[in-house]
Curated annotation (Swiss-Prot):
InterPro entries: Ribosomal_uL22, Ribosomal_uL22_bac/chlpt-type, Ribosomal_uL22_bac/org-type, Ribosomal_uL22_sf. GO terms for biological process: translation. It comes from the Bacteria. This protein binds specifically to 23S rRNA; its binding is stimulated by other ribosomal proteins, e.g. L4, L17, and L20. It is important during the early stages of 50S assembly. It makes multiple contacts with different domains of the 23S rRNA in the assembled 50S subunit and ribosome. Residues 183-194 have a biased composition (Low complexity). GO terms for molecular function: rRNA binding; structural constituent of ribosome. Residues 116-203 are annotated as: Disordered. PANTHER family: CHLOROPLAST 50S RIBOSOMAL PROTEIN L22-RELATED, LARGE RIBOSOMAL SUBUNIT PROTEIN UL22M. This is Large ribosomal subunit protein uL22. Keywords: Ribonucleoprotein, Ribosomal protein, RNA-binding, rRNA-binding. Part of the 50S ribosomal subunit.
Length: 203
């Protein structure tokens, strides 16, 4: 007997000598039924899996009532699960030295009971667990880390932009100074040329 939370009770039985296909024909009839209705259905179902499910339901009901104080009338079957177990392989001798294979299949049974009164709290717990799983998912953690890195890089980029603007201002001032020097040199050359021309005319 396993108890997952305050509103669910799980009873399991393993390695039963029945195929999962045949057992699931009975499991389909039990899902969503009240415990009393499920036991009535099993009592009128002539299948090999019927006594197995009856045993599981009675065990889960007894533990739920004794451990959690649930009322028998409020219990419903939330799920009846049948999984495949290990398969035993045997051989049957046939004619002319041949042999045919025999598969003895087994199954694992699980019945989950829920309380009708605790449905709202159960849904709240389920939603909270979903939120926690989503918040702890690797995609969200990576996105959060990237956002933190981008926020950390933004203030570092601002001083770099300031340095770049200062360098561009210095280069502009240097180019303007060079242009003014060239203009002064040109004016000086023009003045010397005019003086030389006047001297030649005088001679």
């Amino acid at each position: 007997m396993k108890v997952e939370n305050h509103n669910l009770a799980v009873a399991s039985l393993k390695t039963q000598r029945i195929s999962a296909f045949k057992a699931r024909l009975v499991a389909v009839l039990l899902k969503g039924k009240k415990v009393s209705d499920a036991l009535a259905i099993l009592s009128h179902t002539k299948k090999k899996a019927s006594p197995i499910f009856t045993k599981l339901i009675n065990s889960a009901v007894a533990n739920a009532i004794n451990n959690h104080g649930f009322e028998h009338s409020n219990l419903i079957i939330k799920a009846a699960i049948v999984n495949e177990g290990p398969t035993l392989k045997r051989f049957r001798p046939r004619a002319k030295g041949a042999a045919s294979q025999i598969l003895k299949r087994t199954s694992h049974f699980k019945v989950i009971l829920a309380s009708q009164n605790g449905g709202e709290s159960q849904n709240q717990e389920y939603q909270e667990t979903e939120k926690n799983l989503v918040s702890k998912s690797p995609e969200n953690t990576q996105s959060g880390a990237l956002s933190q890195q981008s926020q950390a890089e933004q203030p570092q980029n601002d001083p770099e932009n300031g340095v770049d603007s200062q360098l561009s201002a210095k280069t502009n001032s240097i180019t303007t100074a060079k242009k003014t020097d060239l203009a002064d040199n040109n004016t000086k050359n023009d003045a010397t040329n005019t003086v030389l021309a006047q001297e030649k005319e005088v001679k």
